[in-house]
């Protein structure tokens, strides 16, 4: 999977696609996924860690 930078609404949309029905844990105050996917590029595998 290609790594990509995803920020804000793009990141949320990508999480919806990756996690599907199970949903995901997104808390902008806990910057984990933002640091992993916005400041640095991340892969789908890294995003899956944030699914519920």
Swiss-Prot record:
Subcellular location: Secreted
Gene3D superfamilies: Insulin-like
Molecular functions per Gene Ontology: hormone activity
Covalent S-S links between cysteines: 7-38, 19-51, 37-42
Main localization, broad class: secreted
Keywords: Carbohydrate metabolism, Disulfide bond, Glucose metabolism, Hormone, Secreted
Full protein name: Insulin
